[in-house]
Amino acid sequence: MNDPGLAAFQDLLARPHGILLVTGPTGSGKTTTLYTALSQLNTAERKIITVEDPVEYQLEGINQIQVKPAIGLDFAGALRAIVRQDPDVIMIGEIRDLETCRIAVQSSLTGHLVLSTLHTNSAAASITRLLDMGVESYLIASTVSGILAQRLVRRLDPATRVAFQAPAELIKEHGLDRLTEQRPILLYRGDYHGRSALTELLVMNDELRGLLMVHADAASLEHAARRAGLRTLYEDGLRQALAGVTSLEEVLRVTRGDDV
């Protein structure tokens, strides 16, 4: 995550209540991000309870509950039980239905910080997904504090990474000249080793809340978020490609076809 985005994400984690969502396809690192956030929040003074399916990692000092649909313990049922234990932070492995979402909203309204995941292509699309589930727009506006969308790309190995001058058609197609002052503009190729995250962070603000109240579409929400400083997954990827972290091909592989 870029430095401004990381600072904004940590600011959202520092809030005493609200819903913070992490979204992306399967295998995009959502659970890892949530566990990292929980580790940061995990102090002796803070009571944290998770509801997961499955529990992927054991976190010391955190009460983690595995849902068991076969015996009637689903996400909604587990959440109803843990809210009575008055936790400070609740992590829901995934918001899958309206009932689970309503409990998350109510938990936020009663002073809990709620972390969870969705499967959407972008941060803005998560808002319309919640609306499609049947959550009232005013409840989303008053409880969702931020949404982090992410993708994983393969990282170029510095030992084999080679720079080359970006062709004019690629510069024009992707607007690379607006993203760097470097001349000539360089891109990179080589072998891959490890992975890097592309991120976009939507922070709820008054303009977005106003758009929510009139049921604006995801594109309008994203445009408003960009005016407030949101950097899209695609733009974050282009910047990483220009920095030699990954290749342009990798960025396009994971962001092409995204629509809001």
Sequence positions of predicted segments:
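Short, flexible helix-loop junctions that flank or precede catalytic/ligand sites
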Residues: 1-260
